[in-house]
Amino acid sequence: MIKLFKNYAKIDTANTTLLLASGQGKVFKVYYGKKIKDDTSYLPIIDHDFFELFSSTDDTYYSNMFMSCNGEGNNIENMVRIINEDSTFVSRFKFVDFQIVDVNKPFNEFPHTLNKEETLEITYIDEITNVTLKQYISVFKNSDVLSSYLKVENTSNQNINIQRLLSLQLDFEASEAIMYTLDGAWCRERNINKHHVKNTICMIESRSGFSSNLHNPFVIFEIENEGYFSSNLVYSGNHKELIESTFSYWNRFN
């Protein structure tokens, strides 16, 4: 179930809660973990202005952004990369609104999940280029699964080149993360590998046009004091999954 109140969006599955907040034109992940109550009395505790974005030379700066793009002001792997017609590659997507929408209607262009119970639509717009970005998070009945994807609408009067458009971004605070991957080769696929990620980036990808037996898109992340999280794709194609761990004990999964 999805609930909207004040500048928050609360996304509940059977046993988990994802709590998002908007502020300063951004959307931030406030909480993701075991299911929490609908009591809103705790919200003033976390209802504050978020940090301004500084330059990439400030290694101590970081924030729990739910969507990021080139030009955010930090040195972390981002979710969206768009090249504009004039060859510039900085985007300034600003949050517009939260809406609960119906996305169970036919969606024939791409593979997609079915029987969604509710879907949150997060809309952003780049006021310089006038490009619109929409982020969708869906929940399912009696399940802890979240479905997520991004959609770019070229509402500008110029051509754009989409370099990167990842499906999900989650930030966690921990001194170290562990990434479990399923790697291999033909007839020897899905071997379990465990990667300790600290002050570095761990990434798998396929550029062959299909998911491939080299790196399965299903990955598991173990985050200190948070537990285990996993992700997978609903299609076979090129993919990339990565987790970046910083010196400041922040971890970003894309």
Question: Model-predicted segments: where are they?
Answer:
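Basic/polar N-terminal segments that are highly enriched at the extreme N-terminus
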Residues: 1-4
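Polysaccharide-binding surfaces and accessory modules of carbohydrate-active proteins
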Residues: 7-10, 16-18, 27-253
